[in-house]
Amino acid sequence: MSDTLTADVIGRRVEVNGEHATVRFAGVVPPVAGPWLGVEWDNPERGKHDGSHEGTVYFKCRHPTGGSFIRPNKVNFGTDFLTAIKNRYVLEDGPEEDRKEQIVTIGNKPVETIGFDSIMKQQSQLSKLQEVSLRNCAVSCAGEKGGVAEACPNIRKVDLSKNLLSSWDEVIHIADQLRHLEVLNVSENKLKFPSGSVLTGTLSVLKVLVLNQTGITWAEVLRCVAGCPGLEELYLESNNIFISERPTDVLQTVKLLDLSSNQLIDENQLYLIAHLPRLEQLILSDTGISSLHFPDAGIGCKTSMFPSLKYLVVNDNQISQWSFFNELEKLPSLRALSCLRNPLTKEDKEAETARLLIIASIGQLKTLNKCEILPEERRRAELDYRKAFGNEWKQAGGHKDPEKNRLSEEFLTAHPRYQFLCLKYGAPEDWELKTQQPLMLKNQLLTLKIKYPHQLDQKVLEKQLPGSMTIQKVKGLLSRLLKVPVSDLLLSYESPKKPGREIELENDLKSLQFYSVENGDCLLVRW
Protein backbone atom coordinates (compact mmCIF):
# COMPACT_ATOMS: atom_id res chain seq x y z
CA MET A 1 0.00 0.00 0.00
CA SER A 2 1.27 3.47 -0.86
CA ASP A 3 2.24 6.08 1.73
CA THR A 4 -0.57 8.33 0.48
CA LEU A 5 -3.20 5.86 1.53
CA THR A 6 -1.82 5.44 5.02
CA ALA A 7 -1.25 9.15 5.58
CA ASP A 8 -4.57 10.83 4.86
CA VAL A 9 -7.07 8.32 3.61
CA ILE A 10 -8.97 7.71 6.87
CA GLY A 11 -12.19 9.72 6.94
CA ARG A 12 -12.13 10.41 3.20
CA ARG A 13 -15.37 10.14 1.27
CA VAL A 14 -15.30 7.74 -1.67
CA GLU A 15 -17.51 6.40 -4.43
CA VAL A 16 -17.65 2.80 -5.62
CA ASN A 17 -19.93 1.86 -8.52
CA GLY A 18 -22.25 4.76 -7.79
CA GLU A 19 -22.47 4.11 -4.02
CA HIS A 20 -20.98 6.51 -1.46
CA ALA A 21 -18.97 5.49 1.60
CA THR A 22 -16.49 6.74 4.22
CA VAL A 23 -13.04 5.20 4.62
CA ARG A 24 -12.64 3.85 8.17
CA PHE A 25 -9.53 1.65 7.78
CA ALA A 26 -6.46 1.30 5.55
CA GLY A 27 -4.04 -1.58 5.86
CA VAL A 28 -3.48 -5.31 5.56
CA VAL A 29 -6.23 -7.85 6.26
CA PRO A 30 -4.64 -11.31 6.70
CA PRO A 31 -4.50 -13.87 5.30
CA VAL A 32 -4.98 -12.09 1.95
CA ALA A 33 -1.90 -10.11 0.90
CA GLY A 34 -1.88 -6.50 -0.23
CA PRO A 35 -3.52 -3.27 0.93
CA TRP A 36 -7.23 -2.97 1.71
CA LEU A 37 -9.58 -0.13 2.47
CA GLY A 38 -12.30 -0.67 5.04
CA VAL A 39 -15.34 1.44 4.16
CA GLU A 40 -18.65 2.20 5.87
CA TRP A 41 -21.42 2.58 3.29
CA ASP A 42 -24.03 5.33 3.40
CA ASN A 43 -26.48 2.59 2.45
CA PRO A 44 -25.87 -0.17 5.05
CA GLU A 45 -27.55 -2.77 2.83
CA ARG A 46 -24.59 -2.42 0.45
CA GLY A 47 -22.14 -3.84 3.02
CA LYS A 48 -21.33 -7.32 4.29
CA HIS A 49 -20.14 -6.95 7.89
CA ASP A 50 -19.59 -4.55 10.81
CA GLY A 51 -15.86 -3.96 10.22
CA SER A 52 -14.68 -7.32 11.58
CA HIS A 53 -12.98 -10.18 9.77
CA GLU A 54 -12.28 -13.63 11.23
CA GLY A 55 -12.65 -12.35 14.79
CA THR A 56 -10.50 -9.23 14.39
CA VAL A 57 -12.16 -5.79 14.59
CA TYR A 58 -10.55 -3.51 11.98
CA PHE A 59 -13.12 -0.68 12.24
CA LYS A 60 -16.60 -0.09 13.61
CA CYS A 61 -19.87 0.61 11.80
CA ARG A 62 -23.18 1.98 13.02
CA HIS A 63 -24.97 -0.89 11.26
CA PRO A 64 -24.07 -4.61 11.46
CA THR A 65 -23.91 -4.87 7.66
CA GLY A 66 -22.56 -1.39 6.94
CA GLY A 67 -18.94 -2.32 6.18
CA SER A 68 -16.83 -3.80 3.39
CA PHE A 69 -13.16 -4.30 2.50
CA ILE A 70 -12.23 -3.01 -0.96
CA ARG A 71 -9.01 -2.80 -2.95
CA PRO A 72 -7.79 0.81 -3.32
CA ASN A 73 -7.81 0.62 -7.12
CA LYS A 74 -11.58 0.00 -7.08
CA VAL A 75 -12.29 3.24 -5.22
CA ASN A 76 -12.97 6.70 -6.66
CA PHE A 77 -11.55 9.37 -4.33
CA GLY A 78 -13.12 12.09 -6.44
CA THR A 79 -11.87 15.16 -8.21
CA ASP A 80 -11.21 18.79 -7.37
CA PHE A 81 -13.77 21.57 -7.78
CA LEU A 82 -12.17 23.32 -10.75
CA THR A 83 -11.66 20.09 -12.70
CA ALA A 84 -15.32 19.18 -12.15
CA ILE A 85 -16.38 22.60 -13.47
CA LYS A 86 -14.23 22.19 -16.59
CA ASN A 87 -15.57 18.69 -17.19
CA ARG A 88 -19.12 19.96 -17.00
CA TYR A 89 -19.04 23.42 -18.52
CA VAL A 90 -16.13 23.76 -20.95
CA LEU A 91 -17.08 23.03 -24.55
CA GLU A 92 -14.41 21.04 -26.37
CA ASP A 93 -13.12 22.32 -29.71
CA GLY A 94 -12.72 20.07 -32.71
CA PRO A 95 -9.43 18.16 -33.07
CA GLU A 96 -8.14 20.27 -35.97
CA GLU A 97 -8.63 23.54 -34.14
CA ASP A 98 -6.92 22.10 -31.06
CA ARG A 99 -3.84 21.28 -33.12
CA LYS A 100 -3.55 24.66 -34.88
CA GLU A 101 -0.08 26.13 -34.31
CA GLN A 102 0.40 29.81 -33.50
CA ILE A 103 3.38 32.09 -32.86
CA VAL A 104 2.88 34.50 -29.98
CA THR A 105 5.35 36.90 -28.37
CA ILE A 106 5.98 36.72 -24.64
CA GLY A 107 8.37 39.49 -23.64
CA ASN A 108 10.84 39.66 -26.55
CA LYS A 109 10.72 35.95 -27.38
CA PRO A 110 8.50 34.31 -30.00
CA VAL A 111 6.84 31.17 -28.58
CA GLU A 112 5.20 28.44 -30.62
CA THR A 113 1.88 27.32 -29.08
CA ILE A 114 -0.67 24.64 -29.86
CA GLY A 115 -4.36 25.27 -29.20
CA PHE A 116 -3.87 28.79 -27.82
CA ASP A 117 -7.31 29.87 -29.13
CA SER A 118 -8.86 26.89 -27.39
CA ILE A 119 -7.32 27.82 -24.03
CA MET A 120 -8.51 31.42 -24.37
CA LYS A 121 -12.01 30.18 -25.20
CA GLN A 122 -12.05 27.90 -22.14
CA GLN A 123 -10.98 30.74 -19.88
CA SER A 124 -13.67 32.97 -21.37
CA GLN A 125 -16.35 30.31 -20.79
CA LEU A 126 -15.36 29.81 -17.15
CA SER A 127 -15.07 33.51 -16.33
CA LYS A 128 -18.68 34.08 -17.40
CA LEU A 129 -20.13 31.38 -15.15
CA GLN A 130 -22.47 32.67 -12.44
CA GLU A 131 -24.42 29.53 -11.55
CA VAL A 132 -22.73 26.13 -11.19
CA SER A 133 -24.49 22.80 -10.62
CA LEU A 134 -22.11 19.96 -9.74
CA ARG A 135 -24.54 17.60 -8.02
CA ASN A 136 -23.20 14.04 -7.85
CA CYS A 137 -19.96 14.92 -9.68
CA ALA A 138 -17.59 13.28 -7.13
CA VAL A 139 -16.10 16.62 -6.00
CA SER A 140 -13.87 15.92 -3.01
CA CYS A 141 -11.64 18.99 -2.59
CA ALA A 142 -10.97 22.58 -3.61
CA GLY A 143 -7.88 21.83 -5.66
CA GLU A 144 -4.94 24.16 -6.25
CA LYS A 145 -5.09 27.26 -4.07
CA GLY A 146 -6.24 30.31 -6.01
CA GLY A 147 -7.14 28.32 -9.11
CA VAL A 148 -10.89 28.70 -8.69
CA ALA A 149 -10.70 32.43 -7.95
CA GLU A 150 -8.64 33.01 -11.09
CA ALA A 151 -10.70 30.83 -13.45
CA CYS A 152 -14.25 31.48 -12.16
CA PRO A 153 -14.32 34.91 -10.48
CA ASN A 154 -18.03 35.58 -11.06
CA ILE A 155 -19.72 32.50 -9.59
CA ARG A 156 -22.67 33.44 -7.38
CA LYS A 157 -24.54 30.15 -6.96
CA VAL A 158 -23.07 26.67 -6.37
CA ASP A 159 -24.80 23.30 -5.98
CA LEU A 160 -22.36 20.77 -4.51
CA SER A 161 -24.99 18.35 -3.19
CA LYS A 162 -24.27 14.60 -3.05
CA ASN A 163 -20.52 14.79 -3.63
CA LEU A 164 -17.47 13.43 -1.79
CA LEU A 165 -16.69 16.40 0.43
CA SER A 166 -15.67 15.13 3.86
CA SER A 167 -15.39 18.30 5.95
CA TRP A 168 -16.72 21.83 6.36
CA ASP A 169 -13.12 23.04 6.12
CA GLU A 170 -12.94 21.73 2.55
CA VAL A 171 -16.20 23.54 1.74
CA ILE A 172 -14.65 26.75 3.08
CA HIS A 173 -11.52 26.22 0.96
CA ILE A 174 -13.80 26.29 -2.10
CA ALA A 175 -16.09 29.09 -0.95
CA ASP A 176 -13.17 31.26 0.14
CA GLN A 177 -12.19 31.66 -3.52
CA LEU A 178 -15.70 32.69 -4.61
CA ARG A 179 -15.92 36.28 -3.42
CA HIS A 180 -19.41 36.83 -4.90
CA LEU A 181 -20.94 33.57 -3.63
CA GLU A 182 -24.56 34.12 -2.56
CA VAL A 183 -26.07 30.60 -2.69
CA LEU A 184 -24.34 27.41 -1.51
CA ASN A 185 -25.87 23.92 -1.39
CA VAL A 186 -23.79 21.13 0.18
CA SER A 187 -26.67 18.78 1.04
CA GLU A 188 -26.11 15.00 1.18
CA ASN A 189 -22.41 15.33 1.97
CA LYS A 190 -21.41 13.54 5.18
CA LEU A 191 -19.39 16.42 6.55
CA LYS A 192 -17.16 16.68 9.58
CA PHE A 193 -17.88 20.04 11.17
CA PRO A 194 -15.48 22.13 13.27
CA SER A 195 -15.59 21.79 17.03
CA GLY A 196 -13.86 25.10 17.70
CA SER A 197 -14.74 28.64 16.72
CA VAL A 198 -15.11 29.56 13.05
CA LEU A 199 -13.58 32.69 11.56
CA THR A 200 -16.20 35.36 10.93
CA GLY A 201 -16.61 36.86 7.48
CA THR A 202 -15.57 33.66 5.66
CA LEU A 203 -18.80 33.68 3.63
CA SER A 204 -19.35 37.40 3.89
CA VAL A 205 -21.90 37.81 1.07
CA LEU A 206 -23.64 34.43 1.36
CA LYS A 207 -27.45 34.72 1.49
CA VAL A 208 -28.64 31.10 1.12
CA LEU A 209 -27.05 28.04 2.78
CA VAL A 210 -28.45 24.52 2.25
CA LEU A 211 -27.24 21.83 4.67
CA ASN A 212 -29.91 19.14 4.27
CA GLN A 213 -28.85 15.59 5.23
CA THR A 214 -25.33 16.53 6.28
CA GLY A 215 -25.47 15.19 9.85
CA ILE A 216 -24.93 18.65 11.33
CA THR A 217 -25.89 19.36 14.96
CA TRP A 218 -27.44 22.60 16.25
CA ALA A 219 -24.22 23.63 18.01
CA GLU A 220 -22.33 23.09 14.73
CA VAL A 221 -24.94 25.13 12.86
CA LEU A 222 -24.35 28.09 15.15
CA ARG A 223 -20.56 27.84 14.70
CA CYS A 224 -20.75 27.56 10.91
CA VAL A 225 -23.20 30.41 10.34
CA ALA A 226 -21.01 32.72 12.42
CA GLY A 227 -19.08 33.13 9.16
CA CYS A 228 -22.23 34.24 7.28
CA PRO A 229 -23.11 37.72 8.58
CA GLY A 230 -25.72 38.39 5.87
CA LEU A 231 -27.41 34.98 5.75
CA GLU A 232 -31.12 35.14 4.80
CA GLU A 233 -32.14 31.51 4.18
CA LEU A 234 -30.98 28.39 6.04
CA TYR A 235 -32.11 24.85 5.14
CA LEU A 236 -31.47 22.07 7.69
CA GLU A 237 -33.80 19.26 6.61
CA SER A 238 -33.28 15.68 7.87
CA ASN A 239 -30.39 16.15 10.31
CA ASN A 240 -31.89 14.81 13.58
CA ILE A 241 -31.41 18.29 14.98
CA PHE A 242 -32.19 19.07 18.61
CA ILE A 243 -32.26 22.82 19.27
CA SER A 244 -30.06 22.98 22.33
CA GLU A 245 -29.30 26.68 22.75
CA ARG A 246 -30.55 30.14 21.85
CA PRO A 247 -28.78 31.89 18.95
CA THR A 248 -27.42 35.14 20.33
CA ASP A 249 -25.02 36.77 17.88
CA VAL A 250 -25.93 34.58 14.86
CA LEU A 251 -29.00 33.99 12.65
CA GLN A 252 -30.11 37.56 13.35
CA THR A 253 -30.56 38.27 9.62
CA VAL A 254 -32.23 34.97 8.69
CA LYS A 255 -35.66 35.32 7.05
CA LEU A 256 -36.31 31.65 6.21
CA LEU A 257 -35.47 28.63 8.39
CA ASP A 258 -36.28 25.09 7.23
CA LEU A 259 -36.25 22.45 9.99
CA SER A 260 -38.30 19.83 8.10
CA SER A 261 -37.95 16.14 8.97
CA ASN A 262 -36.06 16.73 12.22
CA GLN A 263 -38.11 14.43 14.42
CA LEU A 264 -36.50 15.49 17.72
CA ILE A 265 -37.91 19.03 17.61
CA ASP A 266 -40.74 19.99 19.97
CA GLU A 267 -42.46 23.22 21.00
CA ASN A 268 -40.09 23.84 23.93
CA GLN A 269 -37.15 23.97 21.53
CA LEU A 270 -39.00 26.45 19.34
CA TYR A 271 -38.98 28.95 22.20
CA LEU A 272 -35.18 29.12 21.76
CA ILE A 273 -35.57 30.53 18.23
CA ALA A 274 -38.74 32.52 18.93
CA HIS A 275 -36.95 35.87 19.15
CA LEU A 276 -35.05 35.85 15.86
CA PRO A 277 -35.91 39.40 14.78
CA ARG A 278 -36.21 38.92 11.00
CA LEU A 279 -37.55 35.37 10.73
CA GLU A 280 -40.45 35.51 8.23
CA GLN A 281 -40.78 31.86 7.12
CA LEU A 282 -40.52 28.81 9.37
CA ILE A 283 -40.85 25.31 7.89
CA LEU A 284 -41.62 22.57 10.43
CA SER A 285 -43.03 19.85 8.16
CA ASP A 286 -42.64 16.23 9.31
CA THR A 287 -41.21 17.10 12.72
CA GLY A 288 -43.95 15.42 14.74
CA ILE A 289 -45.13 18.75 16.17
CA SER A 290 -48.59 18.40 17.74
CA SER A 291 -48.96 21.48 19.92
CA LEU A 292 -47.83 25.07 20.24
CA HIS A 293 -48.39 27.55 23.06
CA PHE A 294 -47.48 31.18 23.63
CA PRO A 295 -47.79 31.56 27.41
CA ASP A 296 -46.87 35.26 27.36
CA ALA A 297 -50.14 36.17 25.57
CA GLY A 298 -53.62 35.90 27.05
CA ILE A 299 -56.95 35.55 25.23
CA GLY A 300 -57.24 38.15 22.47
CA CYS A 301 -53.62 39.30 22.88
CA LYS A 302 -50.55 38.98 20.66
CA THR A 303 -47.36 37.19 21.66
CA SER A 304 -43.90 38.78 21.64
CA MET A 305 -42.52 35.58 20.10
CA PHE A 306 -41.80 35.24 16.37
CA PRO A 307 -42.45 38.97 15.83
CA SER A 308 -41.83 38.91 12.05
CA LEU A 309 -43.17 35.44 11.18
CA LYS A 310 -45.43 35.71 8.11
CA TYR A 311 -45.48 32.13 6.78
CA LEU A 312 -45.62 28.92 8.81
CA VAL A 313 -45.50 25.41 7.31
CA VAL A 314 -46.56 22.48 9.52
CA ASN A 315 -47.46 19.82 6.93
CA ASP A 316 -47.27 16.08 7.75
CA ASN A 317 -47.41 16.44 11.52
CA GLN A 318 -49.62 15.26 14.41
CA ILE A 319 -51.87 18.29 14.89
CA SER A 320 -55.13 16.95 16.30
CA GLN A 321 -56.43 19.80 18.52
CA TRP A 322 -58.15 22.99 17.34
CA SER A 323 -56.37 24.86 20.12
CA PHE A 324 -53.26 24.76 17.89
CA PHE A 325 -54.89 27.25 15.51
CA ASN A 326 -56.18 29.42 18.37
CA GLU A 327 -52.55 29.85 19.43
CA LEU A 328 -51.52 30.86 15.90
CA GLU A 329 -53.99 33.75 16.15
CA LYS A 330 -51.56 35.21 18.72
CA LEU A 331 -48.74 35.58 16.16
CA PRO A 332 -48.69 39.28 15.25
CA SER A 333 -47.43 39.01 11.65
CA LEU A 334 -48.77 35.62 10.46
CA ARG A 335 -50.37 35.90 7.02
CA ALA A 336 -49.91 32.45 5.43
CA LEU A 337 -50.21 28.90 6.78
CA SER A 338 -49.76 25.44 5.29
CA CYS A 339 -51.02 22.53 7.42
CA LEU A 340 -51.69 19.68 4.99
CA ARG A 341 -51.85 16.01 6.01
CA ASN A 342 -52.49 16.39 9.72
CA PRO A 343 -55.09 14.36 11.67
CA LEU A 344 -57.42 17.38 11.74
CA THR A 345 -57.11 18.19 8.04
CA LYS A 346 -56.34 15.04 6.06
CA GLU A 347 -59.85 13.57 5.66
CA ASP A 348 -61.13 14.50 2.19
CA LYS A 349 -64.75 14.69 3.32
CA GLU A 350 -63.83 17.09 6.13
CA ALA A 351 -61.29 19.21 4.24
CA GLU A 352 -63.67 22.09 3.49
CA THR A 353 -65.00 22.14 7.06
CA ALA A 354 -61.46 22.19 8.45
CA ARG A 355 -60.48 25.01 6.10
CA LEU A 356 -63.40 27.17 7.22
CA LEU A 357 -62.67 26.55 10.91
CA ILE A 358 -59.01 27.51 10.48
CA ILE A 359 -59.92 30.69 8.58
CA ALA A 360 -62.40 31.67 11.30
CA SER A 361 -59.82 30.96 14.03
CA ILE A 362 -56.99 33.08 12.56
CA GLY A 363 -58.27 36.53 11.69
CA GLN A 364 -55.23 37.96 9.88
CA LEU A 365 -54.62 34.92 7.64
CA LYS A 366 -54.53 35.74 3.90
CA THR A 367 -53.43 32.39 2.45
CA LEU A 368 -54.17 28.83 3.60
CA ASN A 369 -52.45 25.82 2.02
CA LYS A 370 -51.23 28.04 -0.84
CA CYS A 371 -54.80 29.07 -1.69
CA GLU A 372 -55.76 32.72 -1.26
CA ILE A 373 -58.52 33.48 1.24
CA LEU A 374 -60.93 35.79 -0.58
CA PRO A 375 -63.08 38.25 1.43
CA GLU A 376 -66.29 36.34 0.66
CA GLU A 377 -64.72 33.07 1.87
CA ARG A 378 -63.64 34.70 5.13
CA ARG A 379 -67.08 36.20 5.64
CA ARG A 380 -68.75 32.85 5.09
CA ALA A 381 -66.27 31.04 7.39
CA GLU A 382 -66.75 33.54 10.21
CA LEU A 383 -70.55 33.59 9.90
CA ASP A 384 -70.69 29.79 9.86
CA TYR A 385 -68.39 29.62 12.88
CA ARG A 386 -70.51 32.14 14.76
CA LYS A 387 -73.63 30.12 13.95
CA ALA A 388 -72.12 26.67 14.58
CA PHE A 389 -71.05 27.49 18.13
CA GLY A 390 -73.94 29.82 18.95
CA ASN A 391 -75.79 27.42 21.23
CA GLU A 392 -72.56 26.66 23.08
CA TRP A 393 -72.01 30.41 23.42
CA LYS A 394 -75.47 30.90 24.94
CA GLN A 395 -75.03 27.99 27.35
CA ALA A 396 -71.66 29.45 28.44
CA GLY A 397 -73.28 32.76 29.44
CA GLY A 398 -73.37 34.60 26.12
CA HIS A 399 -75.98 37.34 25.62
CA LYS A 400 -76.96 39.70 22.80
CA ASP A 401 -76.52 42.59 25.20
CA PRO A 402 -72.72 42.90 25.74
CA GLU A 403 -73.30 44.20 29.27
CA LYS A 404 -75.09 40.98 30.18
CA ASN A 405 -72.35 38.74 28.79
CA ARG A 406 -70.96 36.42 31.44
CA LEU A 407 -68.95 34.02 29.32
CA SER A 408 -67.10 31.20 31.02
CA GLU A 409 -63.32 31.11 30.84
CA GLU A 410 -63.58 27.64 29.32
CA PHE A 411 -65.60 28.96 26.35
CA LEU A 412 -63.30 31.95 25.86
CA THR A 413 -60.27 29.64 25.83
CA ALA A 414 -61.86 27.29 23.29
CA HIS A 415 -63.22 30.12 21.09
CA PRO A 416 -61.02 33.20 21.64
CA ARG A 417 -62.32 35.03 18.52
CA TYR A 418 -66.04 34.43 19.15
CA GLN A 419 -66.62 37.69 20.99
CA PHE A 420 -64.91 39.61 18.19
CA LEU A 421 -67.13 37.88 15.59
CA CYS A 422 -70.21 38.91 17.57
CA LEU A 423 -69.01 42.51 17.48
CA LYS A 424 -68.27 42.25 13.75
CA TYR A 425 -71.50 40.56 12.61
CA GLY A 426 -73.78 40.89 15.59
CA ALA A 427 -74.66 38.20 18.13
CA PRO A 428 -76.48 35.16 16.68
CA GLU A 429 -80.27 35.43 16.75
CA ASP A 430 -82.37 32.72 18.36
CA TRP A 431 -83.95 31.75 15.03
CA GLU A 432 -80.48 31.16 13.54
CA LEU A 433 -79.60 28.70 16.27
CA LYS A 434 -82.70 26.55 15.75
CA THR A 435 -81.53 25.36 12.33
CA GLN A 436 -78.87 22.71 11.70
CA GLN A 437 -75.37 24.10 12.11
CA PRO A 438 -73.43 24.12 8.80
CA LEU A 439 -69.99 23.40 10.21
CA MET A 440 -71.26 20.39 12.12
CA LEU A 441 -72.75 18.80 9.00
CA LYS A 442 -69.76 16.86 7.74
CA ASN A 443 -71.88 14.96 5.20
CA GLN A 444 -74.75 17.40 4.56
CA LEU A 445 -76.61 16.26 1.44
CA LEU A 446 -77.94 18.78 -1.07
CA THR A 447 -80.82 17.85 -3.38
CA LEU A 448 -79.99 19.45 -6.74
CA LYS A 449 -81.51 19.51 -10.21
CA ILE A 450 -79.11 18.95 -13.10
CA LYS A 451 -79.90 20.58 -16.47
CA TYR A 452 -78.07 20.70 -19.81
CA PRO A 453 -78.73 24.06 -21.57
CA HIS A 454 -77.04 22.96 -24.83
CA GLN A 455 -78.54 19.46 -24.86
CA LEU A 456 -82.29 19.97 -24.78
CA ASP A 457 -82.99 16.28 -25.42
CA GLN A 458 -81.28 15.33 -22.13
CA LYS A 459 -83.68 14.60 -19.29
CA VAL A 460 -83.44 16.82 -16.19
CA LEU A 461 -81.98 14.80 -13.31
CA GLU A 462 -82.29 15.17 -9.56
CA LYS A 463 -79.30 14.13 -7.44
CA GLN A 464 -78.28 14.26 -3.80
CA LEU A 465 -74.68 15.42 -3.43
CA PRO A 466 -72.62 16.22 -0.27
CA GLY A 467 -72.08 19.93 0.23
CA SER A 468 -68.40 19.20 0.87
CA MET A 469 -68.01 17.56 -2.57
CA THR A 470 -65.44 19.36 -4.72
CA ILE A 471 -66.27 20.62 -8.20
CA GLN A 472 -63.63 18.22 -9.53
CA LYS A 473 -65.50 15.24 -8.05
CA VAL A 474 -68.85 16.54 -9.32
CA LYS A 475 -67.33 16.70 -12.81
CA GLY A 476 -66.01 13.15 -12.41
CA LEU A 477 -69.49 11.92 -11.49
CA LEU A 478 -71.08 13.72 -14.44
CA SER A 479 -68.35 12.49 -16.78
CA ARG A 480 -69.17 8.88 -15.97
CA LEU A 481 -72.90 9.56 -16.18
CA LEU A 482 -72.80 11.42 -19.51
CA LYS A 483 -69.82 9.64 -21.11
CA VAL A 484 -68.16 13.03 -21.68
CA PRO A 485 -64.47 13.78 -20.84
CA VAL A 486 -64.01 15.73 -17.61
CA SER A 487 -61.92 18.35 -19.42
CA ASP A 488 -64.89 19.21 -21.67
CA LEU A 489 -67.34 19.93 -18.84
CA LEU A 490 -68.25 23.46 -17.75
CA LEU A 491 -70.35 23.85 -14.60
CA SER A 492 -72.43 26.68 -13.19
CA TYR A 493 -75.55 26.92 -11.07
CA GLU A 494 -78.62 29.04 -10.54
CA SER A 495 -80.68 29.50 -7.40
CA PRO A 496 -84.37 30.36 -6.89
CA LYS A 497 -83.11 32.90 -4.34
CA LYS A 498 -81.10 34.69 -7.07
CA PRO A 499 -83.38 34.64 -10.15
CA GLY A 500 -81.75 35.52 -13.45
CA ARG A 501 -78.20 35.10 -12.07
CA GLU A 502 -75.90 32.25 -13.13
CA ILE A 503 -72.79 31.56 -11.03
CA GLU A 504 -69.80 29.76 -12.57
CA LEU A 505 -68.18 26.89 -10.64
CA GLU A 506 -64.71 27.60 -12.00
CA ASN A 507 -62.34 26.34 -9.29
CA ASP A 508 -62.19 22.53 -9.36
CA LEU A 509 -60.64 22.38 -5.88
CA LYS A 510 -63.48 24.26 -4.18
CA SER A 511 -66.61 22.57 -2.79
CA LEU A 512 -70.29 23.12 -3.53
CA GLN A 513 -70.52 24.72 -0.08
CA PHE A 514 -67.82 27.21 -1.00
CA TYR A 515 -70.03 28.54 -3.82
CA SER A 516 -73.05 28.63 -1.45
CA VAL A 517 -74.93 25.96 -3.41
CA GLU A 518 -78.07 25.05 -1.43
CA ASN A 519 -80.96 22.59 -1.47
CA GLY A 520 -83.21 23.12 -4.50
CA ASP A 521 -80.55 24.86 -6.61
CA CYS A 522 -79.95 23.79 -10.21
CA LEU A 523 -76.61 22.70 -11.69
CA LEU A 524 -76.09 23.74 -15.32
CA VAL A 525 -73.82 21.43 -17.31
CA ARG A 526 -72.32 22.38 -20.69
CA TRP A 527 -69.83 20.68 -23.00
Curated annotation (Swiss-Prot):
Keyword annotations: Acetylation, Chaperone, Cytoplasm, Cytoskeleton, Disease variant, Dwarfism, Intellectual disability, Leucine-rich repeat, Neurodegeneration, Phosphoprotein, Repeat
InterPro entries: CAP-Gly_dom_sf (IPR036859), CAP-Gly_domain (IPR000938), LRR_dom_sf (IPR032675), Ubiquitin-like_dom (IPR000626), Ubiquitin-like_domsf (IPR029071), Ubl_TBCE (IPR044079)
Residues recorded with modification Phosphoserine: S495
Domain CAP-Gly: 27-71
Residue list for modification N6-acetyllysine: K463
Domain LRRCT intervals: 342-384
Sequence positions bearing N-acetylserine: S2
Signal peptide: none
Annotated LRR repeat ranges: 154-175, 180-200, 205-226, 230-252, 253-274, 278-299, 308-329
GO molecular function, one term: alpha-tubulin binding
Subcellular location: Cytoplasm; Cytoplasm, Cytoskeleton
Gene Ontology terms: biological process: adult locomotory behavior; developmental growth; microtubule cytoskeleton organization; mitotic spindle organization; muscle atrophy; peripheral nervous system neuron axonogenesis; post-chaperonin tubulin folding pathway; post-embryonic development
GO CC annotations, alphabetized: cytoplasm; microtubule
Disorder: Hypoparathyroidism-retardation-dysmorphism syndrome: An autosomal recessive multisystem disorder characterized by hypoparathyroidism, intrauterine and postnatal growth retardation, psychomotor retardation, epilepsy, microcephaly, and facial dysmorphism.
Family classification: Belongs to the TBCE family.
Subunit field text: Supercomplex made of cofactors A to E. Cofactors A and D function by capturing and stabilizing tubulin in a quasi-native conformation. Cofactor E binds to the cofactor D-tubulin complex; interaction with cofactor C then causes the release of tubulin polypeptides that are committed to the native state. Cofactors B and E can form a heterodimer which binds to alpha-tubulin and enhances their ability to dissociate tubulin heterodimers. Interacts with TBCD.
Protein task: Tubulin-folding protein; involved in the second step of the tubulin folding pathway and in the regulation of tubulin heterodimer dissociation. Required for correct organization of microtubule cytoskeleton and mitotic splindle, and maintenance of the neuronal microtubule network.
Name assigned to this protein: Tubulin-specific chaperone E
Lineage, uppermost ranks: Eukaryota, Metazoa, Chordata, Craniata, Vertebrata
